[in-house]
Each structure stands twice: as structure tokens, then as C-alpha cells.
């Protein structure tokens, strides 16, 4: 095709970032992540266990890994979704309507902590009220 990888440093080639979310019941959490990220399914692949993509093609793809047993310890990472302050309320409402729960709004206007049905956390953040 005539495409060439242009290194950005020693030994550097192409890098692609994806987010993988472990889940016991993928169809129960996928709608939450679709709503909170404002993502879509790939054309022709929008089933209950299919990956999600950023419709603007700027953010990483999100895919779901089937787990056989729950993991009792707390997640060691979480996702921050930064949105314009005037979109935060509607993004949170969409995520809650899609099965999410509000974990904390103690720092509301700066960020809210939400979780999907299996406890995977995401913070919806804005620039307001930052320290």
C-alpha cells in the first residue's frame, strides 16, 4: 500500500491504545460504558458483547473480556472522562439510565465517580472547581 511507519524514538513503531474491561456479564455493563463514553458500536458490530469505538476516532477502542469468576479486590485503575462542564449532567444521567450507579458526588462540578453494574469505576470530570 505504500504505507511506512515513522519511528518517534529509538525502536519506536506503531502504538495503539485500547481499554479492556473485565466483566462477568458483558451485556449488563456495555450500555453503561457506551453512554458514559458517548461511544458507538462499529458499523455492523453493535451486539451486546461487541467492542465500542469513539465516533470521532480520537479516543481508544473499548472491548470487554469475559471473566469466569468475580475479582473481589478493588480495581487498581479507573477511567477519567473529561467533558465540557455544560455536558456533565447529561452524560451522568445517560450513564445512570444505562445501569450505572453514582458512587460519589462529593467533588461535584470537578468530578463525579460512577460505576457500572459490576463495580468498574469511571470519573466524569470537568475543569470547574479544580484545586
What residue spans do the PLM features occupy?
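Generic short beta-strand
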Residues: 50, 111-112
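Glyoxalase I/VOC metalloenzyme domain signal
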Residues: 1-45, 53-103, 115-131
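Short, small/polar residue-rich loop motifs at catalytic or cofactor-binding pockets
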Residues: 107-109
Amino acid at each position: 500500500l505504500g504505507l511506512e511507519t515513522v519511528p518517534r524514538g529509538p525502536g519506536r513503531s506503531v502504538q495503539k491504545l485500547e481499554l479492556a474491561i473485565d466483566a462477568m456479564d458483558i451485556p449488563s455493563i456495555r450500555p453503561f460504558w457506551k453512554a458514559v463514553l458517548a461511544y458507538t458500536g462499529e458499523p455492523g458490530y453493535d451486539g451486546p458483547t461487541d467492542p465500542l469505538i469513539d465516533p470521532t476516532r480520537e479516543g481508544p477502542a473499548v472491548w470487554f473480556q469475559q471473566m469466569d469468576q468475580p475479582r473481589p479486590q478493588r480495581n487498581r485503575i479507573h477511567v477519567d472522562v473529561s467533558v465540557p462542564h455544560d455536558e456533565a449532567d447529561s452524560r451522568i444521567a445517560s450513564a445512570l439510565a444505562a445501569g450505572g450507579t453514582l458512587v460519589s458526588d462529593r467533588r461535584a462540578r470537578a468530578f463525579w465517580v460512577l460505576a457500572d453494574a459490576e463495580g468498574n469505576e469511571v470519573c466524569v470530570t470537568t475543569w470547574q472547581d479544580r484545586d
